UniProtKB/Swiss-Prot annotation:
Its EC number is 5.6.2.2. Required for formation of the double-strand breaks (DSBs) that initiate meiotic recombination. Required for crossover recombination and chiasmatic segregation of chromosomes during meiosis I. Also involved in the faithful equational segregation of chromosomes during meiosis II. This is Meiotic recombination protein rec12. CDD domains: TOPRIM_TopoIIB_SPO. The active site is at 98 (o-(5'-phospho-dna)-tyrosine intermediate). PANTHER family: MEIOTIC RECOMBINATION PROTEIN SPO11. GO terms for molecular function: ATP binding; ATP hydrolysis activity; DNA binding; DNA end binding; DNA topoisomerase type II (double strand cut, ATP-hydrolyzing) activity; metal ion binding. Residues 5-137 form the Topo IIA-type catalytic domain. Mg(2+) binds at residues 179, 229.
Length: 345
């Protein structure tokens, strides 16, 4: 099903949904009118790690007039989506929120309703013509052509746009996915040849993940490496980039499966800078246990080894534990260039 067909499905679903609701209201014998959405229970901290999360969908029923505020919020969101689909314009979640702040009260209300709507229809959020507000940054030798005819470059850190991309061109050999913005900014000051740098400033948003997938398709010969804190949270973020998130299980095209962990690894830190390590807490240990059970990591021996080492020594460390970080990066990329492999030890 192409993009236009998906938009037709979304439009038809919304119109039928509204029609059914109005029809129920017109029946004088009914004391209340019900609407239903498919909602998900998902673990908010482990991203894609709970393999059973996608199976725990449930239907949430809202009754009018008992849940009149929620229903009003739902129909306001549907109105915005319907307008965006008909006019073929892309709006952001924040646009919807600011159209009726008094009604929504919180941005998360809009986020949850959009997730439930797309989950109920069985489409992605982009099929609703709604994107998250820009969060991620990209830097490097890259030209991005938008569908509106604009061509943008990233010779300075560029906010990843929600506008539709028609093509991406670059001669880069490497794409570095960085967990932290501070580390990203440090690398923009270095002369890293043939390299594109991307950060989502922590846990990745959907827009940044989808941009990376488009980048991977545009640059099939480039190698994608991830740089994350040597702790369970960092590897959880790596997992979300590579395997996706339960919160957007209906967004199958946001998994960067060719992403490989560059580091830092145990030997990068503890052979030199043990004083920069921190002790694991109970939450860290619980996360490590979950990560070791995660299906995606069963075929990643390097990642499993790092997690096991964390448990064994009861320590963790941040990227900043690498004192000569720019030199370390250049050395890792040089090793990858010599080996011609997609993983570096």
């Amino acid at each position: 099903m192409n993009s236009n067909d998906k938009k037709k499905v979304v439009r038809s679903w919304i119109e039928q949904f509204v029609h059914d609701f109005v029809e129920q209201l017109s029946k004088p014998t009914k004391d209340s009118v019900n609407v239903a959405l498919k909602r998900r229970k998902h673990n908010s901290w482990n991203g894609s790690l709970d393999s059973k999360a996608n199976e725990r969908q449930k239907v949430k029923v809202f009754s009018f007039p008992r849940n009149e505020t929620t229903i009003a919020q739902l129909f306001r969101v549907l109105d915005c989506v319907h307008e965006a689909v008909i006019s073929d314009t892309v709006i952001t979640k924040r646009d919807i929120y600011y159209r009726d702040v008094d009604l929504f009260k919180r941005q998360t209300v809009v986020d949850e309703l959009l997730g439930d709507i797309s989950n109920t229809i069985g489409c992605s959020r982009s099929d609703l013509n709604v994107e998250a507000s820009a969060k991620g940054l990209v830097f490097g030798s890259i030209h991005i052509a938008l569908e509106n005819g604009t061509v943008i470059t990233a010779t300075k850190p560029l906010l990843i746009s929600h506008h539709r991309i028609s093509s991406i061109t670059s001669t880069a050999k490497w794409v570095l996915v960085i967990e932290k913005e501070a580390v990203f900014q440090t690398l923009t000051e270095e002369a890293l040849a043939d390299t594109i740098i991307v950060t989502a400033k922590g846990f990745p948003d959907l827009m940044t993940r989808k941009f990376l997938v488009k980048l991977a398709k545009a640059l099939p010969d480039a190698k994608f490496f991830g740089i994350f804190d040597w702790d369970p949270h960092g590897l959880c973020i790596y997992s979300c980039f590579k395997y996706g998130s339960n919160a957007y299980s209906h967004e199958p095209h946001s998994q960067l499966r060719n992403l490989q962990l560059l580091g830092p690894l145990y030997e990068d830190i503890f052979n030199k800078n043990q004083e920069f390590s921190l002790k694991l807490n109970k939450r860290d240990i619980k996360m490590i246990t979950t990560l070791l059970q995660f299906e995606g990591f069963q075929k990643e021996p390097v990642v499993r080894e790092q997690l096991q080492r964390m448990l064994f020594i009861q320590k963790k460390a941040e990227i900043q534990a690498i004192l000569e970080f720019p030199s370390w990066i250049k050395g890792k990329l040089a090793d990858a260039d010599k080996s011609g492999k997609h993983s570096v030890r």
